[in-house]
Amino acid sequence: MAPNLRKSHPLLKMINNSLIDLPTPSNISAWWNFGSLLGICLTTQILTGLLLAAHYTADTTLAFSSVAHTCRNVQHGWLIRNLHANGASFFFICIYMHVGRGLYYGSYLYKETWNTGVILLLTLMATAFVGYVLPWGQMSFWGATVITNLFSAIPYIGQTIVEWAWGGFSVDNPTLTRFFTLHFLLPFMIMGLTLIHLTFLHESGSNNPLGIVSNCDKIPFHPYFSLKDILGFMLMFLPLMTLALFSPNLLGDPENFAPANPLVTPPHIKPEWYFLFAYAILRSIPNKLGGVLALAASMLVLFLAPLLHKSKQRTMTFRPLSQLLFWTLTANLLILTWVGSQPVEHPFMIIGQLASLTYFTILLILFPLTGALENKMLNY
């Protein structure tokens, strides 16, 4: 019998082992769809981004008008831009769901996969931040100024780092050109990290909703999960296209319709919606360095997830107390997101401070305590 090419060819063999003959737990739910959705998001963003980069000019005098030119004069330029801008929002929705799934089902116990995933999240956040600066609107400019300026809180070397990052004494042309360079480079870095992430995942195989070893009950990825993933793609592309075609500016900031002006500060500087929770944590501490540390900690705390797992059970499927905490954390993040979009005044300040405190308390204290308590209740 002739050898099967997809199983013997050096390149096809890798694809086959990752996407076709991959042994997959038979009981993984729709929460396991977000990995492939993130892959399709990344591909879409890179394709639309390349098309936009072909018409973009990374110069302070031309950036704003080059984006307007793309939308007005380039064939379907408006659609490409709207897909790229709103595609970023869907990218973040998917990654937050993906991380949430990992926390709920104890996927973080695959330490290498989890750690590369957290690095991917941080890289994605950096990419989105530098990308937001490129249209050179008011919020782009002031967002860049405020966030890069946070590095000046680092003792002794802070100011030097900021001026080095800016390429001058304020956000200006050198800043824009290097941000464009970074925004072009980072997605390819994300692609590389994704391959590392998948390599580590395929070492252990997927987790499943029961959190038990599923080697005795695995099915091939294709056709079962390839079909399920395609359904996921369609269910994501439908709202993305709806948003991009019917209300493309719904999630954007109206300030960004005005070209960047260093002499006029917008009344309320705020990032895109997907960074608002972190922005609320940053603002909730009335000290610059403290705020920066809290902001960093809000993301880096994810690295500690494997160390804070005290339960004998892997997932939260049969742990009602931990479930209650998990959904409280979810609600808390939504509150932080809302507070981040509000002005810095009473009562939003105190709500933000309480929500920030709750965020860290749940993750660092209550999750491990509850895990230990549930062990006790089950006489483990």
Swiss-Prot record:
| Record bears the keyword NADP | no
Keyword list, A-Z: Electron transport, Heme, Iron, Membrane, Metal-binding, Mitochondrion, Mitochondrion inner membrane, Respiratory chain, Transmembrane, Transmembrane helix, Transport, Ubiquinone
Q: Which domain of life is it from?
A: Eukaryota
Q: Give binding positions for a ubiquinone.
A: 202
Q: For this UniProt entry, which segments traverse the membrane?
A: 34-54, 78-99, 114-134, 179-199, 227-247, 289-309, 321-341, 348-368
Q: Name one GO molecular function term.
A: ubiquinol-cytochrome-c reductase activity
* GO biological process: one example: mitochondrial electron transport, ubiquinol to cytochrome c
* One family name in Pfam for this protein: Cytochrom_B_C
> What's an example GO cellular component term for this entry?
respiratory chain complex III
Q: Which InterPro entries match?
A: Cyt_b/b6_C, Cyt_b/b6_C_sf, Cyt_b/b6_N, Cytb/b6-like_sf, Cytochrome_b, Cytochrome_b_C_euk/bac, Cytochrome_b_N_euk/bac, Di-haem_cyt_TM
Give the cofactor note: Binds 2 heme b groups non-covalently.
* Cellular localization per UniProt: Mitochondrion inner membrane
Specify the protein's topology with respect to the membrane: Multi-pass membrane protein
Answer whether the UniProt record assigns the keyword Acyltransferase to this protein: no
Which amino acid positions bind heme b b562, per UniProt? 84, 183
State where heme b b566 binds.
98, 197
Its primary localisation, in coarse terms, equals mitochondrion
- Requisite cofactors: heme b
Family affiliation: Belongs to the cytochrome b family.
Its function, per the record, reads: Component of the ubiquinol-cytochrome c reductase complex (complex III or cytochrome b-c1 complex) that is part of the mitochondrial respiratory chain. The b-c1 complex mediates electron transfer from ubiquinol to cytochrome c. Contributes to the generation of a proton gradient across the mitochondrial membrane that is then used for ATP synthesis.
Describe its partners and assembly state. The cytochrome bc1 complex contains 11 subunits: 3 respiratory subunits (MT-CYB, CYC1 and UQCRFS1), 2 core proteins (UQCRC1 and UQCRC2) and 6 low-molecular weight proteins (UQCRH/QCR6, UQCRB/QCR7, UQCRQ/QCR8, UQCR10/QCR9, UQCR11/QCR10 and a cleavage product of UQCRFS1). This cytochrome bc1 complex then forms a dimer.
**Extra remark:** Heme 1 (or BL or b562) is low-potential and absorbs at about 562 nm, and heme 2 (or BH or b566) is high-potential and absorbs at about 566 nm.
Name of the featured protein: Cytochrome b
The organism named in the record is Balearica pavonina (Black crowned-crane)
